Regions:
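Intrinsically disordered, low-complexity boundary segments flanking structured domains
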Residues: 1-2, 14-15, 129-134
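Acidic, metal-ligating active-site segments
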Residues: 29-52
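Structured nucleic-acid-interacting core domains from mobile-element enzymes and related host factors
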Residues: 5-29, 96
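Alpha-helical scaffold segments in carbohydrate-active enzymes
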Residues: 2-9, 86, 109
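Glycine-rich, charged/polar anion/phosphate-binding loops
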Residues: 12, 32-35, 89
């Protein structure tokens, strides 16, 4: 019943990409901690926006059990970074070179891990494949920034939301009522 109510209420929502869309990329990553009650694995969520419009998103259960929120957020940031690097390579094909793409994360601890080139005993257990994010921070491909949880757009990919948060995040992702846009275009 809830699913049908959701579908009925969102059937006219869509993404609108005006012709004068710029090339400013930003990304958001988030995770829950142990959200799957069967195996206690966390969910990584991320989204990438081009000039404030959603162009890529992901929500995936992590392959290992994170033992802290910082670890779960770090793994999610690494997954988001790989998507950012792919988008950068696609834009380079069109001679658009972008560096220092902002990646927003709501975990100060995960951000500190990204900036720390030294492995400490508390992070040695994290699989090596996730540490490539440090290289991209050092090389200036991405910049990790803190974002308040209340402004985290990737929340929609990791957890259920109340209606107010849901509507706020949809607007932040550039989702609009496409019926109203198509009406205004036909009237012009």
């Amino acid at each position: 019943k809830n699913i049908f109510r959701y579908l009925k209420g969102t059937v006219s929502l869509g993404l609108w990409y005006p012709s004068k869309t710029g090339f400013f990329i930003q990304a958001f990553s988030d995770s829950d901690l142990g959200g799957c009650t069967l195996d206690r694995k966390s969910t990584s969520g991320g989204c990438q926006l081009l000039d404030g419009k959603l162009v890529s998103w992901q929500s995936k259960k992590q392959t290992c059990v994170a033992i802290s929120t910082a670890e779960a957020e770090y793994i999610s940031a690494a997954a988001c970074t790989s998507q950012i690097i792919w988008i950068q390579s696609q834009l380079r094909d069109y001679a658009i070179n972008m560096k220092k793409i902002p990646l927003y994360c709501d975990s100060q601890s995960a951000i500190r891990i990204c900036h720390n080139p030294v492995q400490h005993s508390k992070t040695k257990h994290i699989a090596l494949r996730y540490h490539f994010i440090k290289d991209h921070v050092e090389d200036g491909n991405i910049e990790i920034h803190f974002v308040k949880t209340t402004e985290q757009l990737a929340d929609i990919f990791t957890k259920p939301l109340d209606e107010k948060s849901f509507v706020r995040i949809l607007a932040g992702l550039g989702m609009i009522d496409v019926n109203s846009v198509s009406k205004s275009i036909t009237q012009e």
